[in-house]
Amino acid sequence: ESVQAGNANHDPATDATSTWWLNVSATNRWKAFDGGLSDPVTQAGDVSYVLSFSKTADCVALFGLNAETVRVEITDPVEGVIHDQTYPLISSEEVHDGWTYCFAEFTYSTDLVVRDLPFYSGTELEITVHSTGPTEVGEILIGVDHYIGKTLVDTSIGLQDYSVKERDAWGAMQIVERGFTRTVDYRFSFATEDAQRIQRIMSRIRARVAVFSGGDGAAQ
């Protein structure tokens, strides 16, 4: 955002003292990489990104989705397309018997973690988030997947709600809806010989945005 008139030929990237420019937020297209979920990309129709890699990675995580499918395509400059898969986001979590199979409302997962992907230097990654209506993408994270242990049965989940509920002087309930945070407290077991490796991983990500996933299935 420009902070004063006559702002011509001033590069925001070199304005370290915010004399001409104020960093307000990422533009709509790049909100998927701003490190937060509160302000998603919003667009009618598909949201697509094409990213080039100079390092090795093997995992893509997408959060805050309002979409129907996610397509992940990886292209090698010599071999061509080496991975192309579409991941449906429709969820069966609400279906647990014959009645809910017939009458439960369709729901879609808002998060997706894709592992075992062949990223390496020179490859190109294309991510397409598809919806027939309005599409939202909260955040996209790309990195290396590290196994740190097996989750245990007493892992707990929670919800931190920042909404306000209070009564006014006449007793009427006033509700102000705000954002919320989903929380999880993972308990997991790991081999003793893995302790130092896990500690090194935690040290590297201690001041960075990171994804912790319980995985799919009871053994993850």
Annotated model-derived regions:
Residues S2, L51-F53:
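Hydrophobic residues in beta-strands and at strand termini
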Residues V47-Y49:
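Short strand-edge motifs at loop-to-beta-strand transitions and within beta-strands
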Residues A13-T14, S52, S92:
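Intrinsically disordered, low-complexity regions enriched in Ser/Pro/Gly/Gln/His and often acidic
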Residues E1-D34:
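Tryptophan-rich substrate-binding surfaces of secreted polymer-degrading and adhesive proteins
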Residues S25-G45, K55-Q220:
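Extracellular/virion structural assembly segments
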